[in-house]
């Protein structure tokens, strides 16, 4: 029998619905199938693929013979730090930037970065509240003051309009973070920063390989950091990299956490303490660097494969009333970390996110509520004893962050082709949507 609801491609769908103009992609083209008893009400669950096979699909990180060979070669080599220097060269070429420096994680790269900025104590830094604490907490070591900025409730990205409202004469830096691999509007952010005389530090810890206007994330700001932690798109188990457009910033960041041959400082440099650095050792582990180099060779292809699988799934799910995904600019290419982030409009769906997640989980899906911490609500920012200058902590929720925490949920990323499992995921969603009456009361 011919399908009365053929799957539309994304462009055709957007032309029909006008969803792009609304800033969200959603598809009301759904005819409910015959209702089946939900698994949570005693019915048979839809997702039946054995758990071991599901784990194989969703497993991350994924290391194969090339990675194992690279690590073993590093173990056998007498040039212990050769993989570290090689990774720096390759990452610099990949981004097209003048300076990079390895670190043992993204947090140490950020700490070095804040030192390298050489700002007077009390300087304010505009940071997203909805981020990992490492974006913010290292500021306290240098007397810097975080100013918490809201997130765009559609994309999770840095809310530039809120940043404009919070600008003061003490503002020196803004730190846009590319959440889940979604590129921020760096062209607009850079224009704002240039107009106001601000430094831009990209937190690209999630955005390895993402781009805007053909330019990689991490190459847009005055400076940037990356994390290579095991869950990231470029996983070395642990590691990080700082990116710098100016030699002086590069040298200050280097001397803060590196010494001896790693420092690479000229005799004329005011930061020429090659033998000692400034007392810290933030060097990346050479085996992690070897692993990262092997992973870098396949980064773009892995990202492309993940995008393709997300599209295969989402183009079907978005036909269900109330479901949408974060909109991506036509001139941007996002990556995905750590999940496939979606939104539920409870009014259009006819049931709550809580009821949906309960029903989907019972059907065997691995779906989670997208509740992201608002950093300004954590205790460390309100206890003045840890800060030279107390953070400016807004009362209550930031509205964009609150909206995200109300509507967001995540599905696991398919890291290998699994048509049977993907079909079961789609059927589980369709089954739940067809049982709206049962869910409305929950």
PLM-predicted stretches and their roles:
Residues 28-83, 89, 93:
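C-terminal segment of N-terminal export signals and the immediately downstream linker at the start
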Residues 39, 115-204, 211:
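PLP-dependent aminotransferase-like
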Residues 80-124, 138-140, 148, 215:
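Phosphate-binding glycine-rich loop
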Residues 260-271, 315-317, 356-409, 438-442:
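Conserved PLP cofactor-binding pocket of PLP-dependent enzymes
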